[in-house]
Structures are given as C-alpha cells and as structure tokens.
Amino acid sequence: MAASSLSVILIILGSVLLILTTIPVKNTIEDNTLTVNYIIGKKKIDITGAVFMPVPDEARHNLVRVAGTSIGKINSGNFKNYKTGTIFKLYLCGKGEQVYFEVGETKYLIDNLIRK
C-alpha cells in the first residue's frame, strides 16, 4: 500500500515538473539569440536571419494546438493549420509581447514593444 502511494506521488510530482518546463514566463533577446525562460529551465533559439514581420493573417487562421501549454495569456507549443498543413512552433509570452515562431524554415520574430 505504501509503495503504491509513493509511486502515485512520484508520478504526480514528475508530471507537475514536466508541465512547469513548458510554461514560458519571459522572453529576452540578446546577441541574435532569443531566450525563452520557462518556470523551470530555458531554451535558447538562434534568431540570426529571422524575418522581423508578422506572418500573414490567413496563416494564423484555423490553427489547432498539437502540443503545448496555455495558462492565461501565456502560450507555448506546436500549432498546425489544418487547411494549409503548415506547422508553427510558437513561443509566446503575453507578459513580454514577444512572439517567436517557425514556419517551415522561415523564422519569425515579432516584438510589439519595439516594432509598432
């Protein structure tokens, strides 16, 4: 009985830790690198050659999340446009208003605070 309770606790704890590694809290840009800071951990993304423009509106319609996390205005994950078949890797933090995503081989970075 105690062993099964411990197993359940470890599974729940592991699941919570895994979820916390997918929730972005702050994005920073420095030396052609976008750093996506998660609650636990961070990911550095090379943005050399990124296109500093928003993706056309029609590409953002019909998006369905295939993996990722959403809590309030914080979103992160992989999205697929089922009409065009385009897959987006989206890192969005509503706090910083920065969006980084990849469409195929093209990298997009939008910073609404700087490029309005």
Question: Where are the model-predicted features located?
Answer:
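Short, structured coil/loop segments at alpha-helix boundaries
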Residues: 1, 39-42, 114
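Alpha-helical transmembrane spans
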Residues: 1-26
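Generic low-polarity alpha-helical segments
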Residues: 5-12, 50, 86, 116
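Non-transmembrane, membrane-adjacent beta-strand/coil modules in membrane-associated proteins
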Residues: 37-104
